[in-house]
Amino acid sequence: FETLASYGEVQQEKVDDMREQNKSVHSQQKIALVVDSTCDLPVDILEKHHIHVVPVRLNFGKEQYIDRVTISNEEFYSKLANSAHHPQTSQPPPADFRRMYQFLSSHYESVISLHLPKVLSGTYQNASAALEKVTFKEHQVILDSLSVSAGTGVIALELAEAIDQNMSFAELTQLADETVEKTEIFI
């Protein structure tokens, strides 16, 4: 998008991960797990467990990026060290969540969507508003992680491993509640 911006003004950015979509089509899992990109898990773990990520927006002054899509972690830390602007984030728009849920609803029976605490960000609310407009065959739930970064990552990994073990949706939501309750992170 940076290259295109030099030729004019980018009005809107839309990015789809075709590799991830292909994996979803061929997945044997019945329950999808969705997180936002503040969930601090390495890409190899996200891919291994088919964890679907809706990216947050990052702003350095007037420059806007889509986390992990139009800016890598390395580029982010380089900008952090060299930019005169302190980065700011904004939650993914409801349309990003809706697009993700619509795609997943055609390949999975249920979805668990785990996000930043609703008291810290509008991410949870945007995910919830989007999910109200999409129907899965079985179940759908939005979970407040009550945590950030690595804390959300721990919860997501616990759920992903349980999904891999074919736990039922009811067992997964109970596990989520227990894991959220016992997960603490110090900043």
Question: What is each of the regions a protein language model found here?
Answer:
Residues 131-151, 168-173:
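Short, acidic/small-residue loops that bind anionic groups at enzyme active sites
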Residues 110-117, 141-144, 158:
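Short glycine-rich or small-residue beta-strand-to-loop segments that form or flank ligand, phosphate
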Residues 27, 98-109:
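Glycine-rich phosphate/diphosphate-binding loops that line cofactor/substrate pockets in enzymes
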Residues 2-25, 161-187:
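Internal, active-site/partner-interface "lid" segment
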Residues 32-91, 96:
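N-terminal glycine-rich anion-binding loop in soluble enzyme alpha/beta folds
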Residues 151-165:
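Short, small-residue alpha-helix embedded
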Residues 115-135, 154-157:
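Short Gly/Thr/Asp-enriched flexible loops that form oxyanion-binding sites at enzyme active sites
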Residues 94-103, 127-130:
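Short, charged beta->alpha transition segments
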